[in-house]
Amino acid sequence: MTLACCKLDPHPQSPARQHTGPWLVWLHGLLGSGQDWLPVAELCGDYPSLLIDLPGHGNSVALTTTGFEDISRQISETLQANGIREYWLAGYSLGGRIAMYHACYGHKVGLQGLLVEGGNLGLESDELRKARFEQDCQWAQRFRHEPLPQVLADWYQQDVFADLDSQQREQLVAVRANNHGPAVADMLEATSLGHQPWLLPALQCLSVPYTYLCGERDHKFQQVAHQYKLPLRTLARAGHNAHRANPGAFAALVLSFLSQSSFLPLSSFLPPSR
């Protein structure tokens, strides 16, 4: 199954126009869509970009997934269907968790590196995972049965969004109210932290470069990054959704990471054409 997506060509003057990659592949958070990444992707225009709509979101609203292994496979099939052989994978929040899982356990041929924004590494015990799944199921029931603006008003009161002021919360509620509640609920349950493996050991064994991006006001994930010695890059004037709050600074950090991370394009290993 392939996911809905949007392709962005590199700038006309970009060297990337001369060959087939690498691409930047962007995964959004819960309640978002691939278009959330558009301001950042356009600022990273030396690279072609693929903005994916995850199951239950955007133009993939009618698609479902059974969990992390399944959605990793869907991403691989989407890349193949779009002719993408080399790529950097970037994800925010839920998208970051999916990106980490894919890099650790998925079919990652062609993966050049990983960029994670505010992604949770998982929970270390069965007890914690069980409690989190129960909590996510409660939210899912609300998304299924209550008016979406009412649920979203409570959703954005969670601690991870503490940096938002009332006007910013109202703006997010208005933007996200175009989601389909039951589809969001299905995705929330399928990708609950209660179902996610503890990813730190596998991350530490990655054979590709990776970085962890975080807004300076996102205290929860700043702490995660410091506690587990993740390769942290901090964005000024931003909280949990740093790429939305400060797309220019976010794009600059992405481009800095790409330029500092050496890689050999797949074409280097292919025989010359005759």
Swiss-Prot record:
Keyword NADP: no
InterPro entries recorded: AB_hydrolase_1 (IPR000073), AB_hydrolase_fold (IPR029058), SHCHC_synthase_MenH (IPR022485)
Record pathway: Quinol/quinone metabolism; 1,4-dihydroxy-2-naphthoate biosynthesis; 1,4-dihydroxy-2-naphthoate from chorismate: step 3/7; Quinol/quinone metabolism; menaquinone biosynthesis
Known EC number: 4.2.99.20
UniProtKB keywords: Lyase, Menaquinone biosynthesis
Molecular functions (GO terms): 2-succinyl-6-hydroxy-2,4-cyclohexadiene-1-carboxylate synthase activity
Swiss-Prot/TrEMBL GO biological process terms: menaquinone biosynthetic process
Swiss-Prot/TrEMBL catalytic activity: 5-enolpyruvoyl-6-hydroxy-2-succinyl-cyclohex-3-ene-1-carboxylate = (1R,6R)-6-hydroxy-2-succinyl-cyclohexa-2,4-diene-1-carboxylate + pyruvate
NCBIfam families: menH_SHCHC (TIGR03695), PRK11126.1 (NF008340)
Quaternary structure annotation from Swiss-Prot or TrEMBL: Monomer.
Purpose: Catalyzes a proton abstraction reaction that results in 2,5-elimination of pyruvate from 2-succinyl-5-enolpyruvyl-6-hydroxy-3-cyclohexene-1-carboxylate (SEPHCHC) and the formation of 2-succinyl-6-hydroxy-2,4-cyclohexadiene-1-carboxylate (SHCHC).
Family affiliation: Belongs to the AB hydrolase superfamily. MenH family.
Protein name: 2-succinyl-6-hydroxy-2,4-cyclohexadiene-1-carboxylate synthase
Organism: Yersinia enterocolitica serotype O:8 / biotype 1B (strain NCTC 13174 / 8081)
